[in-house]
């Protein structure tokens, strides 16, 4: 098996430009070093990219590169993981049995402080860039996001794009069946996460839901003490990553 951990860094833009400029900030270096150590632990290759694939689109859409760029066809499984995440486990994610893709539902998002924003984005009319209305435009009037299998009481499944574990078969299937990225941006102007959720709602895709320990976020799943296998530092929580990096880094060192 030839597996890859893939990350990319592109300068932040607009209202959150202070999080990272042309040079990679220290929090991003922390995330990179963490994933390099994890790749070595998992006997996987590691790649950090700085070049844009979709040069005409929002840089955050470049996480889709692992799907559309034939370069990745040489790999069996590809773990695309954001730089604002730290690995805190020795469990090998590549050992998980998946079909097309494995991701984590954002448990608690619908009822969090971001829930109002999400409802507005999702439930607005198509003319107002509504995501659900756009989904019905793509897939038919009866379409709706599926329920989470692990967390069925949630309104619908909403997968966080910060961690995506793709099989080769899944990437090739996505390349064939995902709808136009340009059309999505034209209608919604949103980023990759909602695009991926829309596309993976198609019944043809076999999505493995991982529990939240594989992508625990700082906004509403933990506050002071990260408690996941992989911890996701959203917004300005990123600036705490360098202090925690060494704690997790030692977990991944070879044991005698």
Predicted regions and their residues:
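A recognition module on extended beta-rich or small alphabeta surfaces enriched in W/G with H and D/E
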Residues: 244-255
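Catalytic core and acceptor-binding pocket of nucleotide-sugar-dependent glycosyltransferases
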Residues: 139-245
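GT-A fold catalytic core of metal-dependent nucleotide-sugar glycosyltransferases
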Residues: 59-128
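N-terminal anchoring/stem segment of glycosyltransferases
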Residues: 1-76, 234-238, 255
